[in-house]
Amino acid sequence: MSLSSCLLPFSQSATAPSSSVCSCHLAASFSNFPVSSRDYSFSRSGSLVLNGGGSNLCRRFCGLKLWILKSLNRRQGNNRKHQPVNELTTHSKHTFLSDDERGFAEETRAEDLRPEENILGTDLNDGFHNVGDLPPVSKQLSDDLSDVRRRASLCIAVVGATGELARGKIFPALFALYYSGYLPEDVAIFGVSRKNLTDEDLRSIIASTLTCRVDHQENCGGKMDAFQSRTYYINGGYNNRDGMSRLAERMKQIEGESEANRIFYLSVPQEALVDVACTIGDNAQAPRGWTRIIVEKPFGFNSHSSHQLTKSLLSKFEEKQIYRIDHMLGRNLIENLTVLRFSNLVFEPLWNRTYIRNIQVIISESIAQTEKFSDGYGIIRDIVHSHILQTIALLAMEPPISLDGEDIRNEKVKVLRSIRKIDPRDVILGQYKSSSRDKNGVILNGVDPTYCAAALYIDNARWDGVPFLVRVGTGLIKHRVEIHVQFRHVPGNLYRENIGINIDLGTNELILRDEPDEAILVKINNKVPGLGLQLDASELNLLYKDRYKTEVPDSYEHLIHDVIDGDNHLFMRSDEVAAAWNILSPVLEEIDKHHTAPELYEFGGRGPVAAYYLWAKHGVPWADD
């Protein structure tokens, strides 16, 4: 009877003559193993060979292999997004199991094996009170299977822990992940800053900002207490090697000897970023496990400073360790772009210059300007460089070969490198009037824009001649974040006379709205009920709050989860950063060279009048405010 080979995850140093059938590599001596010596022998290569002593023996070893695979899947499931923890997938079965093993799996599919149960038929600890009393092989199996179940520990350090971003966004996002089970129970969270505080001081600061989402109310108080008990404070300056050494030492105390992973969130001013990163790189990287750092935008002030920043980071870390975060890329709208394009046949065949007339990306804020735009970076460096260009890249990229982060980033950078040099005349800058700024308590310097509109073109076969219109501003009439994809007119439209005077009413349009109410809208033409033939433009809408009765996770929660999971497709790679600066640097240099003054507009208005002329210049209808 021919039995399939069973490759168990062990090695063997002994050697013996070769036999046949079911070869299994083991790490320990089998002198005490509960089978007869005639049932096995050793090959010259050091492999254990199970002789044909009946199917029961191989079935027992195949069962052990199934149990180990199931345990591995149980261990790894916690780190997979949207996948049941205890499910052994069909893919895994067909990849790792032979025909006989699959047959055994069919017989035992309904049985839910407990983690402590030995598939050989008895508990590994049966009859033994201490692990040290176990026979050598059983003890070895117990140790190996214990390793399978053991999870790597995780330490997260927030540098700049007392800042507004950390208090208002980062710690609440970490708590939401902890509540949902996306952080291990024994996670250690460290706050690092220059202030002289204690662990209890940090916990008090954090407690004032933590809340439970509507769908996270069960045992909310208990979860908060547990989360705060896992937070610790380290006093250390931005380039304080002693402080980082103390942080690393305290991490080691918590991690013990097990595999340990570390994340460092650098919530620090741009001028301190390099010092902090280099100090971490020299003193606090994980000795066992991976280390990842999160860097906040903007990524430099211009091409030169961005290059120096990248060079400094890569001198201490590998590219795969660096996660350049833009919280606006954590919105559900951004993740939906690739889903809509590549999972719906109704869209992807039309996603090109033949059918699409223009694409508009709109970010309109009704509130006063934030401090970020008042520090000399301005709206172009802060929003257009990362969020807007990344959105365009995801909209325009070719289908990646897989959903792996590197494959997606490879396609995004191709789009960025294909964007035509921007004509300075196709860039409109605006700033809401000083009286409005004074009234709202925000003081800007004379040239920092609070509004930017621009026309971009992508020089490739898919998008040749299609304008991508961008408008970003604050202090405007309406708060909204939307993407408009306007399709071309129907050739030879039979109903042209029935649509009305404005021919643009007859064009189809896809609207992806993130705020104020997330929705997917499709504008279509339909007949008005009644006698005669009159057409109307209507909207098919998917309103998320009506369709999904759940609170959408915050963008920081989404992105930090991706960092833990190692998913980097929403984070900019260094070549993407450089390509984005190559697009914007010539425009910024022209603005600085000629001291271009932004056009003033009323606070709460529609923005600069020149933006309307820019839309008309490129033949694009203005999306209604």
Curated annotation (Swiss-Prot):
Localisation: Plastid, Chloroplast stroma
Active site residues of this protein: H387 (proton acceptor)
Residue intervals passing through the bilayer: none
Keyword Nucleotide-binding included in the entry's annotation: no
A Pfam cross-reference name: G6PD_N
GO MF annotation terms: glucose-6-phosphate dehydrogenase activity; NADP binding
GO cellular component: chloroplast stroma
Gene Ontology biological-process annotations: glucose metabolic process; pentose-phosphate shunt
Disulfide bridge map: C212-C220
Main location: plastid
Binding site for NADP(+) 2: R471, R480, R513, R606
Keyword Chaperone listed: no
Tissue expression as described in the entry: Expressed in leaves, stems and buds.
Keywords per UniProt: Carbohydrate metabolism, Chloroplast, Disulfide bond, Glucose metabolism, NADP, Plastid, Transit peptide
Residues the record lists as binding D-glucose 6-phosphate: K297, H327, M328, L329, G330, R331, E365, D382
Targeting signal (transit peptide) range: 1-49
Amino acids binding NADP(+) 1: G160, A161, T162, G163, E164, L165, A166, R167, R194, K297
Protein family per UniProt: Belongs to the glucose-6-phosphate dehydrogenase family.
Function: Seems to be a catalytically inactive enzyme.
Quaternary organization: Forms homodimer. Interacts with G6PD1.
More details: There are 6 glucose-6-phosphate 1-dehydrogenase genes in A.thaliana.
Name this protein carries in UniProt: Inactive glucose-6-phosphate 1-dehydrogenase 4, chloroplastic
Origin species: Arabidopsis thaliana (Mouse-ear cress)
